[in-house]
């Protein structure tokens, strides 16, 4: 569960390493974002020479959370870290590679390009 001021690792090769959540999209009083939800964030740490610069405001979709999430079949899924993938305005990923597994919820929320780039879908 990601909320305002949460720091999230970036799981793609855009050049950003860590982002800070500014807003959870999906309603004026929405507090938390889970796997497959879109947030607005600012870049807090970036590699030199990357496409993304520190201080840039970006949109990102959450791909991993440490808070467990209950699936419709009764099972739970949780990861070791909170991670996100930076996206463009049309919901396509900004990077060309994705690192680490992603949640199956991304397929249900129509982020097919992220699912196809990911090495593993859990």
UniProtKB/Swiss-Prot annotation:
HAMAP family xrefs: Ribosomal_uL14
GO molecular function, one term: structural constituent of ribosome
Pfam families: Ribosomal_L14 (PF00238)
Matching NCBIfam families: rplN_bact
Gene behind this protein: rplN
GO cellular component: cytosolic large ribosomal subunit
Protein name per its UniProtKB record: Large ribosomal subunit protein uL14
Family affiliation: Belongs to the universal ribosomal protein uL14 family.
Keyword vocabulary terms for this entry: Ribonucleoprotein, Ribosomal protein, RNA-binding, rRNA-binding
Record SUPFAM superfamilies: Ribosomal protein L14
GO process terms (BP): translation
Keyword Transferase: no
Record's function text: Binds to 23S rRNA. Forms part of two intersubunit bridges in the 70S ribosome.
Subunit structure, as described in the record: Part of the 50S ribosomal subunit. Forms a cluster with proteins L3 and L19. In the 70S ribosome, L14 and L19 interact and together make contacts with the 16S rRNA in bridges B5 and B8.
Keyword Ribonucleoprotein among record annotations: yes
